[in-house]
């Protein structure tokens, strides 16, 4: 992708989210690779958001914090994926320097019928914002869920209700867009 964008084959993209495996945490060769390819292809680090699951980050907490700090020092953003799906603890969250909390879809999908799920989403969103993190709701499949997420103040959403997964090709880059949920994306949240 970086090669194609650098060669003028694709339009630059606003944000590219890349899932990392738990094995990547603490892998110095990965950091070296990023340091090498960034100047070669002119990758704007702020346009890349690395994602790691909460379970992987907590299982590797000793390495996760410095690894995330190093990525952020290089200008990349970081997201904690599937938050509250596994071993969640706000103690861990307090020490992980992530930019985004991706609220696990298991809370989102039934939040219209289940007041506990809705309350969990509200609380995670509030705590995330107090900590200076943006929130992302996974598994958004209906307009009704999207509207409730807007009311709650969730920053971003992803799911079939917004766009279906697509093969990666030239048209994908032209047609894809990120859905901001917050009614005022300049609010600083």
Label the model's feature ranges:
Residues 4-5, 9, 19-28, 47-61, ...:
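EAL-family c-di-GMP phosphodiesterase catalytic domain
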Residues 38, 44-46:
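Conserved C-terminal helical docking segment of ANL/AMP-forming enzymes
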Residues 33-37:
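A short, hydrophobic coiled-coil helix within the histidine kinase transmitter core
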Residues 64-65:
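Acidic, serine/threonine- and proline-rich low-complexity intrinsically disordered segments
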Residues 6-14, 42:
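Catalytic core regions of nucleotide second-messenger enzymes
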């Amino acid at each position: 992708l970086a090669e194609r964008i650098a060669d003028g084959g694709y339009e630059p993209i606003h944000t590219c989210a890349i899932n990392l495996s738990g094995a990547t945490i603490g892998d110095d060769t990965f950091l070296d690779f990023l340091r090498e390819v960034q100047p070669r292809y002119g990758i704007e680090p702020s346009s890349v958001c690395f994602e790691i699951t909460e379970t992987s980050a907590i299982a590797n907490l000793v390495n996760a914090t410095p690894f995330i700090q190093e990525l952020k020092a290089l200008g990349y953003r970081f997201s904690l994926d599937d938050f509250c799906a596994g071993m969640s603890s706000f103690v861990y969250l307090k020490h992980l320097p992530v930019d985004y909390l991706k609220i696990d879809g298991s809370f989102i999908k039934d939040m219209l019928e289940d007041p506990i799920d809705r309350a969990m989403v509200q609380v995670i969103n509030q705590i995330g914002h107090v900590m200076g993190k943006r929130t992302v709701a996974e598994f958004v499949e209906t307009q009704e869920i999207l509207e409730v997420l807007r009311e709650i103040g969730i920053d971003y959403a992803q799911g079939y209700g917004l766009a279906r997964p697509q093969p990666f090709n030239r048209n994908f880059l032209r047609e894809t867009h990120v859905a901001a949920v917050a009614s005022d994306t300049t609010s600083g949240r």
